[in-house]
């Protein structure tokens, strides 16, 4: 289990202040626990029970064990690579820890009324805690750790209805699978770009993400209203777009991390988005037309706007002038997101022969 606070080893490890919340940083979520507890799983109970049995096996119980490869690995990185890698560790640890908190609270709050659902969430909380702890331990190699207890108490929590939790976490888990497996496969072919031994663990790690995504797939199928009808189609499109756009803008903004791994951030993200979009067709009624060139052109405009907004924040201009500079960028972002949302989606049935 993740410790509630970061523990300094012989006073050598400092507690790192969490990054300032922005639209691109990981969110912490809460939901309507009574609604979750009252869910009738019978429409897809057999599949959920089968997935829970997979969780019980805990395939990665002995996987996240550090070895001698970590000794001195941090000292081999140049200052810029250290900076972008620590940023990656921090963002990843925060994301995994937010999942742990949500899943743990769900398992605790619905245990009496919905034991099968509660057990599934407890197993996923176990996995997320393991991931977050492993990432935070890697941060200690660089002389710092996150105070996870402070994050628990002081982070703002976003309330989502259960169905929105399903959409967001399903996409987060599936996109996490494709991100991790893509990096792992690239580094297997290009070992000279493996800047830190944590990447050796990504192959098994990504299978946890995949199983979690499969759980939410089965859970949505047990609640047919989440994936059927015109309103469900609109929400599926919205969450696909929000997740893809956020990832693309964030990753291009920190492209130096991917360059350190020998990857191009745009090429990497395009592959991850295409694969996730294809995978999502297994459960969502519609997916995005990511093969339309306009999709990528509009994402690039979001990247440009985000860069301009960050530049305005860094400037020493007076607050009114900063606002004047940022306002047209905000308006442009809204317009581009609207154009992206209004692009014709693809019926998931057209993807089925290709979905594996």
UniProtKB/Swiss-Prot annotation:
Q: Which cofactor does it need?
A: Fe cation
Q: Is Transport one of the keywords? A: no
CDD domains in the cross-refs: ACSF
Top-rank taxon of the source lineage equals Bacteria
Q: What keywords are annotated for this sequence in UniProt?
A: Chlorophyll biosynthesis, Iron, Metal-binding, NADP, Oxidoreductase, Photosynthesis
> Which pathway, metabolic or otherwise, does it act in?
Porphyrin-containing compound metabolism; chlorophyll biosynthesis (light-independent)
Q: Which reaction does it catalyse?
A: Mg-protoporphyrin IX 13-monomethyl ester + 3 NADPH + 3 O2 + 2 H(+) = 3,8-divinyl protochlorophyllide a + 3 NADP(+) + 5 H2O
Check the record and name the InterPro entries matching this protein: AcsF (IPR008434), Ferritin-like_SF (IPR009078), Rr_diiron-bd_dom (IPR003251)
> What EC number(s) does its UniProt record assign?
1.14.13.81
An example molecular function term from Gene Ontology annotations: iron ion binding
- Gene Ontology BP terms: light-independent chlorophyll biosynthetic process; photosynthesis
The record, for PANTHER family, names:
MAGNESIUM-PROTOPORPHYRIN IX MONOMETHYL ESTER [OXIDATIVE] CYCLASE, CHLOROPLASTIC
Show the NCBIfam families listed in the entry: AcsF, PRK13654.1
This chain's function reads: Catalyzes the formation of the isocyclic ring in chlorophyll biosynthesis. Mediates the cyclase reaction, which results in the formation of divinylprotochlorophyllide (Pchlide) characteristic of all chlorophylls from magnesium-protoporphyrin IX 13-monomethyl ester (MgPMME).
Say which family it is in.
Answer: Belongs to the AcsF family.
- What name appears for this protein in its UniProt entry? Magnesium-protoporphyrin IX monomethyl ester [oxidative] cyclase
